[in-house]
Amino acid sequence: MDAGSLDRLVQFQRATITDNGLSQVETFTAHGFPVWARKTDISDGERFRAGEVAANITTRFVVRWSYFTRDMTPKDRLTCEGRTFDISGIKEPEGRRQWLEITAAARAD
């Protein structure tokens, strides 16, 4: 893979816990600067849960390895082109400290 295939900007988000006086609320805010990524949709589908049909899409993002991106975990999420993705897995696909492959899912509707 080459850097020219990184054609999408993604923004990582990290959860912070805030106290609103009645309870603690988890909110996601931008974490760091946007990062260039390659985006590949790998599957889609529908689920019927609690009386509602929800369409979802699973996507694989590849980003350059850096000390910032290696700090991402499945507790974080990312946004790309207005859609928010929950991260389900992160791995180094080839070579050491070159790329990170992030598998994430989002609602398609």
What is the role of each PLM region?
Residues 1-25:
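Active-site-proximal polar cores
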Residues 4, 25-109:
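Short, conserved turn/kink motifs that form compact alpha/beta structural patches or helix kinks used as
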